[in-house]
């Protein structure tokens, strides 16, 4: 019996190697979130275990927030408790997780975020299309991006990508997703909670980075048209 696989191709072999290393790091979190097995790695392609086609939708926001919270809590406990958001974080097997600031410097110049002193989680691009629902729970796919990020930042990407894909979200469901996320990221010795205001500001920051993809990559709705709250006042 031949197992189904998914092949992702890369023009740049460095991108392929980085994605493979990111997948390995995420798989080692062991937090009851499925990570597809890497069947083979070549300079220009990665071949993954195929985990099906069941895509989540807006009604799955809470279960996705729970999975994201478990991943961030496991990463903080295992490695990122010692990380700073403005410095790269060395990991096992030579992996270095990029800092939050450097790859976003232009966007931060336009919209400063005072995050350097906050505890570190990570960003792996929690676009709703980068999750699958399986018989064994939530799975994550697409390992191209991995940087440090404040707690709640990747949850904001989940919110904005879901709204831009499916339309306006129920504000109460977004609120519940944040509560669920904070419940699963809670630490005994540091405040990792993302406030509703922080979530809104992070979403506006993501809007800077995703607006150019409107009507591409599954984004059918402009964020200002589907924002599930009033536009927050943010520092410019």
Features from the language model and the residues they span:
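Active-site activation/catalytic loop segments of kinase-like enzymes and analogous catalytic loops
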Residues: 155-189, 203-222
């Amino acid at each position: 019996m031949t197992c189904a696989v998914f092949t992702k191709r890369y023009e740049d072999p460095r991108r392929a190697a980085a994605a493979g290393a990111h997948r390995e790091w995420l798989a080692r979190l062991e937090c009851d979130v499925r990570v597809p097995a890497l069947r083979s790695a070549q300079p220009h392609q990665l071949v993954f275990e195929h985990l099906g086609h069941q895509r989540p939708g807006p009604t799955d926001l809470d279960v996705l927030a729970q999975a994201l919270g478990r991943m961030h809590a496991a990463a903080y406990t295992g490695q990122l408790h010692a990380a700073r958001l403005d410095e790269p974080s060395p990991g096992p097997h030579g992996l270095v997780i990029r800092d939050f600031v450097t790859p976003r410097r232009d966007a931060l110049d336009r919209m400063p975020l005072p995050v350097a002193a906050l505890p570190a989680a990570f960003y792996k691009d929690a676009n709703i299309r980068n999750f699958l629902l399986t018989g064994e729970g939530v799975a994550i796919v697409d390992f191209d991006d991995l940087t440090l990020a404040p707690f709640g930042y990747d949850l904001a990407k989940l919110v904005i990508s879901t709204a831009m894909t499916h339309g306006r979200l129920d504000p109460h469901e977004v609120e519940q997703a944040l509560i669920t996320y904070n419940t699963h990221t809670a630490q005994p010795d540091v405040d990792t909670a993302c406030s509703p205001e922080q979530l809104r500001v992070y979403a506006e920051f993501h809007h800077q980075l995703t607006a150019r993809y409107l009507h591409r990559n599954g984004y059918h709705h402009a964020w200002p048209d589907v924002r599930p709250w009033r536009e927050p006042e943010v520092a410019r």
